[in-house]
Structures are given as C-alpha cells and as structure tokens.
C-alpha cells in the first residue's frame, strides 16, 4: 500500500497547486447552492410526473464536482460520469435550460430530448455523458484519454464513478491499461455509502 503524501507530491509536480482564496470558496458555495436547487427542482417535477424515466440526483456530492472543476482546464480537459449527471455539464458550461429541456424531452435539450435524465451530453463543452450502465463510463473515459494522447492533444479526462461501480470488472481492466499506457486520466470514486441502495458495509468486493 502506498501512502499519498500531498505535500511531497506537490513539490515533485510539474503543475503548481492552484491557490484557494476566499473568493474561490465563495464561488464553490454559490455553484453548490445552484446545483442543489436545480436538483431539488427536478425532484419536484419528477414527483409531478413531468419528467419520465429514472431520476438519479447528485444531492450531497456537490463538493466533489466543485473542487475538481477548479483543477480543470475547461478549454482542453474532458469529463465523463455515470447517471447522476445533471449538474456536471452545467459546471462545464452547458446552459442549465438545455439540461432541463433534455429531462423534459424537448428538442432544445442537450441530446435533442432523446437521452433523458441519464444521458446528458455535450461534446462542445467536453462533457461525454451520462451513462446508464453501472461502470460503463469507466473504459470510455480511458478511451477518451487515449484518443487525446494518440493525437497529441492537450487535456486530461476526469472520469467519475460511484462506489457501486468498483465491483465491475471493467474498472480493474481499465485501471490496468491506464497505468500501462500512462493515460492522461483521473478516476474519481464518489462514495455515497449506498451505491443505489446497498450499504457499503453489506457489500462484498
């Protein structure tokens, strides 16, 4: 087991850590408040049956997105995640109205109303979904990173997953290839403690 020493790693890094000022903290708080209210509104209209299909909210996980967005270069970096994917594209620059329209099934949505809650997508903003299969986005994230490396493009791919995805074989296979090929990818596990309903304490790995 390797112990991660952030200070030592920072001294060795080619990329200096961004300073976190009071203004940055306030921006994070503002973003997180907006994202929470956005999700709460979706929950309300879902109960009213105005949004069809499934609805997986991001409530309680906003800080992960706020912090990781701060480290990103939005001009070159890319993002891919699972089915809790309503607010990430907003953080990447997608118009919130387009995200809401997608959940309402309108042609003005990010996927022309055909993707729905779990399939928000905007290549123009470097956001590659929203995927309904548990762990399905993990090898795709590696593929996006591989394409950038192969074509000599700048950028890092951030691939988010929940704790339920770590039981998928594709995760371990992807991690192995990402290390062997030295892919420009960051894999982030957002452990909410329950995956979709099973406590981590009752889960076998």
Give the predicted meaning of each segment.
Residues 40-43, 50-181, 199-205:
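Cofactor-binding active-site loop characterized by glycine-rich and histidine/acidic residues
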Residues 162, 189-190:
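Active-site flanking residues adjacent to catalytic metal/cofactor-binding acidic residues
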Residues 26-29:
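Hydrophobic alpha-helical segments at protein termini of multi-pass membrane proteins
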Residues 84, 190-193:
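Short, ordered loop/turn segments at secondary-structure junctions
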Residues 3-13:
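Short, positively charged and aromatic/hydrophobic N-terminal segments
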Residues 193-199:
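Short beta-alpha connecting loops at secondary-structure transitions
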Residues 183-187:
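Short, proline-centered helix/strand-breaking motifs
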């Amino acid at each position: 087991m390797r112990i991660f020493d952030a200070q030592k790693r920072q001294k060795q890094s080619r990329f200096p850590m961004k300073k976190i000022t009071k203004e940055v903290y306030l921006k994070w708080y503002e973003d997180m408040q907006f994202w929470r209210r956005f999700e709460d509104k979706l929950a309300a209209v879902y109960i009213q049956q105005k949004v069809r299909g499934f609805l997986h909210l991001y409530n309680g996980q906003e800080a992960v997105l706020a912090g990781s967005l701060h480290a990103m270069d939005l001009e070159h970096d890319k993002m891919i995640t699972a089915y809790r994917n309503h607010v990430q594209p907003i953080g990447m620059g997608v118009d919130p109205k387009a995200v809401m329209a997608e959940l309402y099934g309108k042609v003005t949505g990010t996927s022309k109303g055909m993707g729905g809650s779990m399939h928000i997508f905007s290549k123009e903003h470097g956001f590659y979904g929203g995927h309904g299969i548990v762990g399905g986005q993990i090898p795709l994230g590696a593929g996006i990173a591989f394409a950038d490396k192969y074509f000599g493009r700048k950028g890092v791919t951030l691939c988010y997953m929940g704790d339920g995805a770590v039981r998928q074989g594709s995760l371990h296979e992807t991690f192995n290839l990402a290390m062997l090929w030295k892919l420009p990818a960051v894999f982030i596990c957002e452990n909410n403690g329950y995956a979709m309903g099973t406590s981590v304490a009752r889960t076998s790995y």
